[in-house]
Amino acid sequence: MVITIKAMETAEEIEGKSRVHWQTWREAYDEILPAEFQEQMTLDKCRLYSQKYPENTLIALDDAKVVGFVSYGDFRDPARIAGEIFALYVLKDYYGKGVGQQLMQAAFAALDGYQEIVL
């Protein structure tokens, strides 16, 4: 298995990232968050996020399939000069295969100009 880490660029990649976001959100939080809250995180909402915020998102591809993503950027508190990792999600079938580590390393490289990175 060769995983490719790259910027999210095409409509197919945006759709793939949206599906990963929705599926992994359910897998991670279904037993933690109330059902009424979970029901608000729809595939359409994930599509909206992916389309509205395509910049600073790296995807992990297994062949042409999106299997994970990381979103990063400037820390949300402008009083603090730092980079931030906003989201990191990997499909359950890819746990333990180093995909999350590859995504984090790529995000750290993209945030290289910062002395501090906040998770």
Which residue ranges define each predicted feature?
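Acetyl-CoA-dependent GNAT
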Residues: 7-93, 104-106, 110
